[in-house]
């Protein structure tokens, strides 16, 4: 049960990082086409930054070395 919880946090963190990457890539492609809305691009950049910070915190919540160390102690 604990391993399933750890995998859920890791999957959620990775999916948020992928979402942030998609948002930032979309913002860069909007800027390269010379859109007239610079505010929309900055909103996408801030949303990507927030999602990436949350994803990194979720990924770092459970460290895989800690899990391996607990298994070795048993």
Swiss-Prot record:
Entry keyword annotation includes Translocase: no
Purpose of the protein: May act as a membrane anchor for the tetrachloroethene reductive dehalogenase PceA.
Protein name: Probable tetrachloroethene reductive dehalogenase membrane anchor protein
Segments traversing the membrane: 11-31, 40-60
Similarity field: Belongs to the PceB family.
Top-level lineage group: Bacteria
Species per Swiss-Prot/TrEMBL record: Sulfurospirillum multivorans
Cellular compartments annotated: Cell inner membrane
Membrane topology: Multi-pass membrane protein
GO cellular component, one term: plasma membrane
Record gene name: pceB
Keywords linked to the UniProt accession: Cell inner membrane, Cell membrane, Membrane, Transmembrane, Transmembrane helix
